[in-house]
Amino acid sequence: LIRENDTIAVPGEKPEESIAYQIAVQAVPELAEKELVAIPMPMTKNAKELEENHRRGAEKIEELLDAGKNVVFLTLGDPTVYSTYLYVHRRVLEDGYDARIVSGVTSFCAAAASLSEGLVENSEELHVIPASYQIEDALQLSGTKVLMKAGKKMPAVKQFLKEKNCRALQQQTINKNIITSHRDTKEINHHGKKENYRW
């Protein structure tokens, strides 16, 4: 799709700095020659601000569609799992345009594969939990827990896991570097700085 279309929407203020772009351009070098359109998607829990950004993103894409362009929207992982793209997708559909989702590989599946680890086997359960919210109840569930989107709360999440003597993650922390350079760590204490993506 990237090769077949000339207009590529990229989440963020600066498309070339987007992790999604940096990964995609390695796989499809022709991407560097395409028209890149920035779709700002600030990470916030402010509902009004989110709504406004989703509206603006959809309008920008609709303007491109009205100009007769086919648009590919890059995103990390799979667009159906905690993806800001979904909000834009729904708006574009509601406004009468054609939009399709192409599945990708979730960050937690990519991380597990890079560690040569399985997430679940046989009758085990898998729970995907947004870690920037309350996680205590979810950690009581049986099976494997995938903690995503911890963001600024990662130090608090790590502390909580240590206090609860939690072994659900087997102390495996993955940040965005797993995606670009396949670096990983098995220490919950390893990172003192802000991290973006982990399971």
Model-predicted segments: where are they?
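Conserved beta-strand scaffold positions in the cores of enzyme catalytic domains, especially
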Residues: L36-A38, A99-I101, V128, A168-Q170
